[in-house]
Amino acid sequence: MVNMKASMFLTFAGLVLLFVVCHASESEEKEFPKEMLSSIFAVDDDFKQEERDCAGYMRECKEKLCCSGYVCSSRWKWCVLSAPWRR
């Protein structure tokens, strides 16, 4: 009976170790493409798009006005598409 408990414990510990090793190697593989893409598409601070003074689609419109083509929803207080059926 003791040998069976020990073998089950070792099997379980081995599976946990295998899971941890696989997860660690997978997370390293996922980091590589992110780093590569961020270095390729890095944008200089001078070329960053300036923030607009209006709120876009589904953005809060309490302090800011909605951008053109959007209206502030009276119920939800965020910018929605302007349409003829909207009030």
UniProtKB/Swiss-Prot annotation:
Family annotation (InterPro entries): Huwentoxin-1, Huwentoxin_CS1
Which domain of life, per UniProt?
Eukaryota
Fetch the Pfam families from UniProt: Toxin_12
Q: Which UniProt keywords apply?
A: Disulfide bond, Ion channel impairing toxin, Knottin, Secreted, Signal, Toxin
Q: Does the keyword Signal apply?
A: yes
Maturation-removed propeptide residues: 25-52
Keyword hit for Kinase: no
Give a short account of what the protein does: Ion channel inhibitor.
Indicate what this protein is called per its UniProt record.
U3-theraphotoxin-Hhn1c
